[in-house]
């Protein structure tokens, strides 16, 4: 045990369709459905035991290097050195900082990218902590629900369910929400996987979110609870997700892209999602051959997802580069969360 090192990783995700309908405030009354795919922008955890009587956390992309000695939550979401996430996962895994741990965490997904990097990190942390504690790993469905409870209940960060499921299961997934949550992994043939990989593009926009993702989600949640027009928008977004699922399994790139476009027109009506600059960038992608696209995650900035024919990839990439957007290469991840043991 002295030289034992635990590592874990979990993938980020691209929410293809249905985003927002996975909010409990919506699906409890109207049902929800989302289509997403896990990608190889991973969140990593490395941890090992020490004899210091405290837990030391290092994360260069979070700009964190701190000791913690208790599990008290600070609830200061905007602090650069926020470690509530680590504390909440330790509490869920029944670990104590005073047991003595060294922990290094790293996320390949930039903060506020809309790719669910924070959810992936929670899943990665949870996998590593269960491993180091020698606890039997939960089944994947229970694992995803536990990660959801940590992020949404313990940390009180608003949002839906899909992020945790993508990070735990990996691959393409269609998830229905209602009285129960049912996840349907979509097992595509190798040719279809290649077709979709050549037809999907991801861009980092030059527009950072002016507000944090959890604030966008909170506004959306508040609108739904008020019973306003957001409910009608989300109903349409949910229905488009079913059509996108059917297009995905058929390999119908154009139809999925067109449904993605219609879904985006509804999503941008939600509070805090789009802006004039984002609309201009999206229109540029469409003018250069994109069938459709959307901002990833809650919106307000971050990453732009585009579906197109393979012949138009370069034209779209060049046009968006002139607008300051950076093409981000990615691959699909079909493993989901994995944790393993090695020596220090």
Segments (PLM) and residue ranges:
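Hydrophobic alpha-helical hairpins/lids featuring a short glycine-rich hinge
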Residues: 92, 104-106
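DPxDG-like acidic metal-binding loop motif
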Residues: 114-136, 168
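A generic structural signal for short coil/turn motifs at secondary-structure boundaries
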Residues: 112-115, 268-270
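C-terminal nucleotide
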Residues: 1-17, 21-28, 34-97, 132-133, ...
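Short pre-catalytic strand/loop immediately N-terminal to key active-site residues, enriched for Gly-Thr
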Residues: 109-113, 291
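Glycine-rich active-site/cofactor-binding loop and its immediate structural neighborhood
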Residues: 301
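Residues at or immediately flanking beta-strands
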Residues: 100-102
């Amino acid at each position: 045990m002295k030289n034992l090192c635990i590592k874990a990783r979990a993938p980020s995700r691209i929410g293809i369709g249905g985003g927002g309908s996975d909010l409990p405030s919506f699906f409890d009354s109207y049902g929800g459905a989302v289509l997403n795919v896990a990608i190889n922008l991973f969140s990593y955890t490395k941890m090992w035991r020490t004899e210091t009587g405290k837990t030391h956390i290092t994360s260069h992309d979070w700009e964190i290097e701190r000791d913690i000695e208790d599990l008290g939550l600070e609830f200061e979401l905007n602090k650069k050195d926020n470690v509530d996430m680590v504390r909440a996962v330790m509490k869920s895994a029944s670990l104590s900082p005073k047991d003595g741990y060294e922990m290094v965490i790293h996320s390949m997904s930039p903060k506020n990218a809309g790719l669910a990097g924070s959810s992936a990190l929670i899943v990665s942390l949870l996998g590593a902590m269960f491993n180091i504690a020698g606890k039997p790993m939960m089944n994947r469905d229970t694992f995803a629900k536990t990660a959801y409870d940590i992020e949404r209940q313990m940390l009180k960060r608003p949002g839906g369910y899909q992020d945790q499921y993508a990070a735990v299961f990996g691959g393409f997934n269609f998830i229905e929400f209602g009285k129960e949550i049912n996840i349907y992994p979509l097992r595509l043939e190798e040719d279809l996987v290649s077709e979709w990989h050549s037809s999907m593009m991801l861009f980092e926009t030059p527009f950072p979110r002016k507000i944090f993702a959890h604030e966008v989600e909170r506004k959306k949640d508040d609108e739904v609870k008020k019973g306003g027009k957001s409910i009608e928008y989300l109903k349409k977004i949910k229905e488009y997700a079913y059509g996108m699922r059917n297009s995905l399994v058929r390999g119908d790139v154009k139809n999925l892209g067109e449904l993605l476009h219609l879904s985006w027109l509804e999503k941008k009506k939600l509070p805090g999602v789009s802006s004039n600059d984002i609309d201009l960038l999206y229109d540029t992608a469409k003018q250069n051959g994109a069938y459709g696209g959307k901002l990833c995650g809650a919106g307000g900035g971050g990453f732009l997802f585009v579906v197109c024919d393979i012949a138009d990839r370069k034209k779209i990439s060049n046009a968006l580069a002139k607008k300051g957007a950076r093409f981000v290469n990615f691959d699909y991840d079909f493993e989901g969360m994995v944790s393993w043991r090695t020596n220090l």
